[in-house]
């Protein structure tokens, strides 16, 4: 698996106007059609371009090794779980290396991944994940994000709240020396959360993968080695 985009950059594709399509949906379609990571994901069999963000995080921080237990929050359609499954060499029925994936949306089956179509904020979801783990987790991943409304401050706060919930959950289930990786949007309100994370992990970094769109304020919180 590589993040090399050689051969995936095509000529610019224009999107014809349509009375049935809003301006925002036309802009989204144009962006998708001209995104080399979308093309690369389709050719290489990944379910979303987000797979390359996790690949970049791993390439820089070396977070995955074989025989790990991983929790993937906000997992649909499954791009991160696909990457994690390959990197830990997950197989169905192996209790030592497995991935637990959770999302409101259905996740099509992935080898070595146990998926739950659940709201992470429902009372029984945490217990469901803990029972499925049959022990502690080595990594908690969260690519959860609220539906954006185009108002940066609001989008920032909403996604930050999701990150805080994922962090509190990670503290409950992570092994000592475990890792926590989560998406946040820059906006200024994240400093309090960062201070909390730094008290619990030996190394805390911000990272923006090259596969993250330049215009996006998203970055990834990389917290390594739970104290």
UniProtKB/Swiss-Prot annotation:
It catalyses: uridine(2552) in 23S rRNA + S-adenosyl-L-methionine = 2'-O-methyluridine(2552) in 23S rRNA + S-adenosyl-L-homocysteine + H(+). It is found in: Cytoplasm. GO terms for molecular function: rRNA (uridine-2'-O-)-methyltransferase activity. The active site is at residue 183. One of its GO terms (cellular component) is cytoplasm. S-adenosyl-L-methionine binds at residues 78, 80, 103, 119, 143. Keywords: Cytoplasm, Methyltransferase, rRNA processing, S-adenosyl-L-methionine, Transferase. Its main location: cytoplasm. Its EC number is 2.1.1.166. Transmembrane segments: none annotated. Pfam families: FtsJ. The keyword Kinase does not apply. It is an enzyme of class 2 (transferase). Belongs to the class I-like SAM-binding methyltransferase superfamily. RNA methyltransferase RlmE family. Specifically methylates the uridine in position 2552 of 23S rRNA at the 2'-O position of the ribose in the fully assembled 50S ribosomal subunit. This is Ribosomal RNA large subunit methyltransferase E. It comes from Rickettsia bellii (strain OSU 85-389). The lineage of its organism: Bacteria, Pseudomonadati, Pseudomonadota, Alphaproteobacteria, Rickettsiales. The gene is rlmE.
């Amino acid at each position: 698996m590589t993040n090399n985009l050689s051969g995936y950059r095509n000529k610019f594709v224009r999107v014809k106007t349509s009375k049935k399509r809003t301006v925002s949906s036309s802009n989204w379609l144009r962006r998708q059609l001209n995104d080399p990571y979308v093309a690369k994901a389709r050719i290489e069999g990944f379910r979303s371009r987000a797979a390359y963000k996790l690949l970049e995080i791993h390439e820089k921080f070396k977070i995955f090794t074989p025989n790990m237990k991983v929790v993937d929050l906000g997992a649909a359609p499954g791009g991160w779980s696909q990457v994690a499954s390959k990197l830990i060499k997950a197989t169905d029925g192996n209790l030592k290396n497995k991935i637990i994936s959770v999302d409101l949306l259905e996740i099509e089956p992935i080898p070595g991944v146990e998926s739950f179509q659940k709201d992470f904020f429902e009372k029984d979801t945490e217990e469901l994940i803990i029972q499925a783990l049959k022990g502690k987790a080595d990594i908690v991943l969260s690519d959860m994000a609220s539906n954006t409304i185009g108002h940066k401050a609001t989008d920032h706060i909403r996604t930050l709240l999701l990150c805080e919930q994922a962090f509190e959950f990670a503290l409950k289930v992570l092994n000592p020396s475990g890792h926590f990786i989560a998406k946040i949007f820059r906006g200024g309100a994240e400093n309090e959360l960062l201070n909390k994370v730094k008290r619990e992990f030996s190394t805390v970094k911000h990272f923006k993968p090259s596969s993250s769109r330049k215009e996006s304020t998203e970055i990834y919180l990389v917290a390594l080695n739970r104290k």
